[in-house]
Amino acid sequence: MAKQVRAKKFLGQHFLRDEYVAEQTANLVDRDAVPSWLEIGPGMGVLTKYLVQKPIEFKAVELDRDSVAYLAKEMPSLEVLEADFLKTDIESLFNGPFGVIGNFPYNISSQILFKILDHRQTVPAFAGMFQLEVAKRIASGPNNKTYGILSVLVQAFYTITLEIEIPPTAFVPPPKVQSAVIYGARIEQEVDWNVKLFFDVVKTAFQQRRKTLSNALKKFNLPKEVCLNNQMFKLRAENLSVSDFIGLTHLIEQHQAQ
């Protein structure tokens, strides 16, 4: 047996050790018949050993050299790329679409999500372990304090379900926070709005979340009568649904084109 890997604080490592959580998380790859999956940060392979049993094309990306060496001894047939997921050209890893799964390091979990969004045409599904607070934020709906930028941007492209809540004892070393697994299934509909503008509108609206939209979105220079005649502009960002934000993006784009 290979020598155990010591978790490295600077990499934000908390190795999963709970077999039930690992098996239930691995089972999520069966949900939408995605043929290929990439695991981020397999560590010592507690989740990985369930994934390699699945009838899928499977690869892993791991930044920690010690973990890569451990996996090479324990799972010699597993293809592990020693690299930083955030700096990896993930489009070149498979010949077609693939899902993303893993116990995501909490200090970069939002960055991982944004990379998935950037490659959403290639990534039809993802399943990840997040800090519970972040997971709830991603899954949150409007009129809720936890509803924010991540909620809207992710839910515009993926249907989100919060699958499992996980206690700190499921990890080594145990984190100081609760965790959760969320699953995202891509929404298969045509994106008929300006995505770059949509991101800008959402981020701008929530950066001043206590202000009404008529004040928070001043930088877009909408005509005053548009703001006065549309009830949406009397609301705050947290009151708008994802579809409201898409409609708002259409409206702003329409007036920018005039």
Model-derived features with residue positions:
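Catalytic cores of RNA-modifying enzymes
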Residues: 1-204, 243-248, 256-258
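C-terminal lobe and adjacent flexible extensions of AdoMet/dcAdoMet transferase-like proteins
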Residues: 186, 204-258
